[in-house]
Amino acid sequence: WIMGHMVNAIGQIDEFVNLGANSIETDVSFDSSANPEYTYHGIPCDCGRNCKKWENFNDFLKGLRSATTPGNSKYKEKLVLVVFDLKTGSLYDNQANDAGKKLAKNLLQHYWNNGNNGGRAYIVLSIPDLNHYPLIKGFTDTLKQEGHPELLDKLGYDFSGNDAIGDVAKAYKKAGVSGHVWQSDGITNCLLRGLTRVKEAVANRDSGNGYINKVYYWTVDKRATTRDALDAGVDGIMTNYPDVITDVLNEAAYKSKFRVATYEDNPWETFKK
């Protein structure tokens, strides 16, 4: 999965997919009542990027729905996975469940079109703080209560705080999650980070009894780092330059080992060599 980083304006969806992304990451900010408000990152953000592009969250969802609904004039067949980077740092811990409920209602109405031919992309809820695990239950309970448990098949999870792998496993246990887990690891492109924890996550994924199904590394803009991440065995690479990742995947060393994922590839299934 080539994951376009910080896609917060509707116009950027096309831009990143046209460069080779089959997945995008979108920032979600919340108001003081735990309502998802904007798709917005703000300053500081990655080096070489404009941090200030934004939409109202529900408007973005409608644009995203157009881009991922077959038959729509804006449809992009390649775009199959969306990571919502939930900026829950502005919330109190006791608001996490509410944030999950409100997020689910917004997605149900504006993205999934109340289950009536809505967007088809798989969705990952990415949460920066392990203490905010109740967000997951708030979200999943709401989908069930609203009569759409089938949409849980489209839903995955990530804790993005670079916490110890064992601590992340405990948070999922508390949240009642088993499966559909992506594990992120990374740092802003302005800084360097080794692959120690990525390798730990990959080992957990491949152990047969770990909690992780997929591993992605962020934010990768250089060819050398891309090669290192692929050599470590990641499933996804988040990038500001999807074309760079595409180029590396076309190199002889990687062409036979990797391909770009399509809608038919289940993002919750651990890949077995």
Swiss-Prot record:
Chemical reaction(s) catalysed: an N-(acyl)-sphingosylphosphocholine = an N-(acyl)-sphingosyl-1,3-cyclic phosphate + choline; an N-(acyl)-sphingosylphosphoethanolamine = an N-(acyl)-sphingosyl-1,3-cyclic phosphate + ethanolamine; a 1-acyl-sn-glycero-3-phosphocholine = a 1-acyl-sn-glycero-2,3-cyclic phosphate + choline; a 1-acyl-sn-glycero-3-phosphoethanolamine = a 1-acyl-sn-glycero-2,3-cyclic phosphate + ethanolamine
Annotated tissue distribution: Expressed by the venom gland.
Major localization listed first in the record, in broad terms: secreted
Enzyme class, broadest EC rank: lyase
Annotated signal peptide: none
Protein name: Dermonecrotic toxin LhSicTox-alphaIA1iii
Cystine bridges: C45-C51, C47-C190
Active-site residues, record numbering mapped to chain: H5, H41
InterPro entries in the cross-refs: PLC-like_Pdiesterase_TIM-brl
Gene3D superfamilies on file: Phosphatidylinositol (PI) phosphodiesterase (3.20.20.190)
GO molecular function (one): phosphoric diester hydrolase activity
Cofactor note: Binds 1 Mg(2+) ion per subunit.
Similarity annotation: Belongs to the arthropod phospholipase D family. Class II subfamily.
EC number: 4.6.1.-
Task of the protein: Dermonecrotic toxins cleave the phosphodiester linkage between the phosphate and headgroup of certain phospholipids (sphingolipid and lysolipid substrates), forming an alcohol (often choline) and a cyclic phosphate. This toxin acts on sphingomyelin (SM). It may also act on ceramide phosphoethanolamine (CPE), lysophosphatidylcholine (LPC) and lysophosphatidylethanolamine (LPE), but not on lysophosphatidylserine (LPS), and lysophosphatidylglycerol (LPG). It acts by transphosphatidylation, releasing exclusively cyclic phosphate products as second products.
Assigned keywords, A-Z: Cytolysis, Dermonecrotic toxin, Disulfide bond, Hemolysis, Lipid degradation, Lipid metabolism, Lyase, Magnesium, Metal-binding, Secreted, Toxin
Residue positions binding Mg(2+): E25, D27, D85
A single Gene Ontology CC term: extracellular region
Name of a matching Pfam family: GDPD_2
